[in-house]
UniProtKB/Swiss-Prot annotation:
It comes from Mus musculus (Mouse). InterPro entries: Transferrin, Transferrin-like_dom, Transferrin_Fe_BS. GO terms for molecular function: enzyme inhibitor activity. Residues 25-347, 355-685 form the Transferrin-like domain. It is found in: Secreted. This is Inhibitor of carbonic anhydrase.
């Protein structure tokens, strides 16, 4: 009986019982043709994989959405899909993750994206804004190229199948419900139950099928990947029979797709479970597969092609697979522009009546909740553990805004966020407060300084090696990027844990020498945390670290003056005078802390509020309104103070006079300026930012 059961299981999964489950990669296939190719994949991998390595089995399902659900349910392990289908599946948060991305172009210049184009026969005359009432062919319901991109371009937000069915006279949208929306399946060519099927059983399924629908004269317009056009029509003579419909309501030749497309979309991607997903085994399997059966290999079996049909297991146009950085989840992979269109179509327009501020750590969350309570519904709060987590949350639409130091602004800019307003500081204006003029006052930036105790007379900038150092946090301008960038220029090494004897650099590995001086907080888990739970976090925390344990501290230039001479009532600052400290100058001399203008490491941009492009104007309006109520001269200043905190620098810097206009510096590059960008670009190889790696994975 046990043998009979195993035999039946093996028939259902094409050999699942022949390998140990923990060594088996269960690949999901959606058609007989894919099952045939997958069987060849399995058999050929047996020849090249080492003994004891992962084995491939093939599991037949009816559609890619079913594959996605079954990966989440641990019934299969992997499939290559359009990332939008994962977002569409509405699975538990982060249950699946992208692990290997198809790339196009050369190995030296891989492109992990493609262009979605609207294609029509030459001479048909209509433009993109004249598609109402036309016949259309689509790759499939829920797919980027054939569904979300054209619908978000052509139809009002919140519209989906119903609106598409009324917009076009008739269509072929494989995977659609033909009973509920008969016009969406009217043009499909499948017979019987195969009509409008969610696999190659429907001849017009996928990008190749949607193009064939146009070639057969079935439709007036087809929405496809540009790659498919060049694969299916290798000669210019064939392509010259068609034209692309452009966003400016003109037409262009097919060759000009880079100037005439609807959207640029991330490539198809191999997905697996986020937990116990066999990620390493799948990546190793595909690495070996590419080495033996990849593009331009002479083997009869081809990973990116098949005699049995098009785009089986992988896209035929793919040149290879790239490992996706671990930080990237499906939201980061797809990007906020695509997700914005996706969310609008799926749920309708987002609620734009309030700003969701991202607080870093519990202390900031407490202040944010106080602000939210008096904001009149204009502000809500989200919480993350690090500034980079807040950047990621904002990209995904889980938060809307936060104030960032220049170092994190550099990361946010690479992730597609934009500056909205800048902090303008009291200390930069010799004449005192600017009042109502502050919002348009020049942004002067601040100095990054290296501070030592006056009594440590032997320490200079040139004798820091082996000393104990205090840093605001890893990734910040004043505490890390500027001083470590200068040290890197001198040593050529990113091993900063070997340069200093011990340090407190919040955000580092808690077990490294870079956290050896940190004090943590009430919870041992807060040791070296990249937020205010670490007592030595921030500029004031770095000064405290210097007072209690360190030899040198890196901070903003006003910090010593803000925490001495009775200005800070905390026990560690009691009795401190600003004369107790000195600045280290780059020429090896030292100066009083009041002379930062002539003795500093660099001048860097002020902190700035960052948001998504689609939310930036709204965030700006809300913050100006809140500032009128709770800013330095606000009408409700006694109820809540935006720029004062129970701890140091919560949500905003405590020395902020106001949030100011950017004065035409509306991109992260123009805001940060060429000098800071050069510093960061030179220092980039020393940046341990998984998010920066994730946001620069797609090379546009």
């Amino acid at each position: 009986m046990r043998l009979l059961i195993c035999a039946l299981l093996c028939l259902g999964t094409l050999g699942l019982c022949l390998a140990l489950p923990e060594k088996t990669i269960r690949w999901c296939v959606v058609s007989d043709h894919e099952a045939t190719k997958c069987s060849s994949f399995r058999d050929n991998m047996k020849k090249v994989l080492p003994a004891g390595g992962p084995a491939v089995t093939c599991v037949r399902k009816m559609s890619h959405p079913e594959c996605i659900r079954d990966i989440s349910a641990n019934k299969v392990d992997a499939v290559t899909v359009d990332g939008a289908l994962v977002a569409e599946a509405d699975l538990p948060h982060h249950s699946l993750k992208p692990i290997m991305a198809e790339y196009y172009g050369s190995k030296d210049d891989p492109k992990t994206h493609y262009y979605v184009v609207a294609m029509a026969k030459k001479g048909t005359g209509f433009q993109l804004n004249q598609l109402r009432g036309k016949k259309s062919c689509h790759t499939g319901l829920g797919w980027s190229a054939g569904w979300y991109v054209p619908l978000s371009t052509l139809l009002p937000s919140g519209s989906r199948e119903t609106a598409a069915a009324t917009f076009f006279s008739s269509s072929c949208v494989p995977c659609a419900d033909g009973k509920m929306f008969p016009s969406l399946c009217q043009l499909c060519a499948g017979k019987g139950t195969d009509k409008c099927a969610c696999s190659s059983r429907e001849p017009y399924f996928g990008s190749w099928g949607a193009l064939k629908c146009l070639q057969d004269g079935t439709a007036d317009v087809s929405f496809v990947k540009h790659l498919t056009v060049f694969e299916a029509m290798p000669t210019k003579a064939d392509r010259d029979q068609y034209e692309l419909l452009c966003m400016d309501n003109t037409r262009r030749p097919v060759e000009e797709y880079e100037q005439c497309y609807l959207a640029r979309v991330p490539s198809h991607v191999v997905v697996a479970r986020s937990v116990d997903g066999k990620e390493d085994s799948i990546q190793e399997l595909l690495r070996v597969a590419q080495e033996h059966f990849g593009k331009d290999k002479s083997s009869p079996f081809q990973l990116f092609g098949s005699p049995h049909g098009e785009d089986l297991l992988f896209t035929d146009a793919a040149h290879g697979l790239l490992r996706v950085p671990r930080k990237i989840d499906i939201s980061l992979y797809l990007g906020y522009e695509f997700l914005s269109a996706f969310r609008n179509l799926k749920r309708g327009l987002e609620d734009s009546q309030r700003v969701k501020w991202c607080a870093v750590g519990q202390q900031e969350r407490t202040k944010c909740d106080q602000w939210s309570a008096v904001s009149g519904g204009a502000l809500a709060c989200a919480t993350e553990e690090t500034p980079e987590d807040c950047i990621a949350a904002t990209m995904k639409g889980e938060a809307d805004a936060m104030s960032l130091d220049g170092g994190f602004a550099y990361v946010a800019g690479h992730c597609g966020l934009v500056p909205v307003l800048a902090e303008n500081y009291l200390s930069t204006h010799s004449s005192g407060r600017l009042g109502s003029k502050c919002v348009n006052a020049p942004l002067e930036g601040y100095y990054v300084v290296a501070v030592v105790k006056k009594s440590d007379v032997g320490i200079t900038w040139k004798s820091l090696q082996g000393k104990k150092s205090c840093h605001t946090a890893v990734g910040t301008s004043e505490g890390w990027n500027v001083p470590m960038g200068l040290i890197y220029n001198q040593t050529g090494s990113c091993k900063f844990d070997a340069f200093f004897s011990r340090s407190c650099a919040p955000g580092s590995d808690p077990d490294s020498p870079l956290c050896a001086l940190c004090v943590g907080g009430n919870n041992p888990a807060h040791m070296c945390a990249a937020n205010n739970a670490e007592g030595y976090h921030g500029s004031s925390g770095a000064l405290r670290c210097l007072v209690e344990k360190g030899d040198v501290a890196f901070m903003k230039h006003p910090t010593v003056l803000q925490n001495t001479d009775g200005k800070n009532p905390e026990p560690w600052a009691k009795g401190l005078k600003h004369e107790d400290f000195e600045l280290l100058c780059l020429d090896g001399t030292r100066k009083p802390v009041t002379e930062a203008q002539s003795c500093h490491l660099a001048r860097v941009p002020n902190r700035a509020v960052f948001s998504r492009k689609d939310k930036a104007d709204f965030v700006r309006r809300i913050l100006f309104n809140q500032q009128e109520l709770f800013g330095r001269n606000g009408f409700e200043y006694m109820m809540f103070q935006m720029f004062e905190s129970s701890a140091k620098d919560l949500l905003f810097s405590d020395d902020t006079e106001c949030l100011s206009n950017l004065q035409n510096k509306t991109t992260y590059k123009t805001y940060l300026g060429p000098q800071y960008l050069t510093l960061m670009d030179n220092f980039r190889q020393c940046l341990s930012s998984e998010l920066l790696d994730a946001c620069t994975f797609h090379k546009y």
